């Protein structure tokens, strides 16, 4: 499938499944080395990161836990910039190495709020792992520890990312066709 139609928009393949798998495996290898002996807990940001987080966990070679938090800042194809926590964190993070697993970092506002909320839980350290990063959209100063793909400022769907709730099941990543 080179192109797909979701609702009123058309999308074309931009990152094939094989390339995603290769990058996720490479990221997991690096993270496994970095996190050896650190008792990490991954916090996947729902809904977009659930496929990435699952694939990443399966490739890890060190013991780690995973939990999920739900935040929202999107409406349609644009970020609202307003973040609201929907589902909180129940795990004790004190003294733990926390790895936030995100599908995409754009402005950085969601990530900044997440890091601030984690700070009150006294983690040993907080690292950020994102599947996609749009450097030209970044408004907040962030240290992204692990980035699978730096991409241009185009709207994408697939591999967990959606357009109004649709398209998450696509194995490839698709870019909107203007």
Write out the residue ranges for each language-model feature.
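PRPP-associated nucleotide enzymes
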Residues: 1-178
């Amino acid at each position: 499938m080179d192109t797909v139609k979701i609702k009123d928009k058309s999308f074309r393949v931009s990152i094939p499944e094989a390339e995603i798998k290769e990058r996720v495996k490479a990221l997991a290898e690096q993270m496994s080395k970095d996190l050896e002996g650190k008792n990490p807990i991954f916090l996947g940001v729902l809904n977009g990161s659930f496929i990435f987080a699952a694939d990443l966990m399966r490739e890890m070679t060190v013991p780690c836990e995973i939990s999920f938090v739900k935040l929202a800042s999107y409406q349609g194809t644009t970020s609202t910039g307003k973040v609201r926590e929907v589902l909180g964190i129940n795990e004790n993070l004190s003294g733990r190495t926390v790895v936030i697993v995100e599908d995409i970092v754009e402005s950085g506002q969601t990530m900044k709020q997440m890091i601030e909320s984690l700070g009150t839980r006294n983690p040993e350290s907080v690292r950020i792992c994102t599947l996609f990063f749009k450097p030209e959209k970044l408004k907040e100063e962030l240290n992204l520890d692990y980035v699978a793909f730096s991409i241009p400022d185009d709207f994408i769907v697939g591999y967990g990312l959606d357009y109004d709730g649709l398209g998450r099941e696509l194995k490839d990543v698709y870019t909107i066709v203007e």
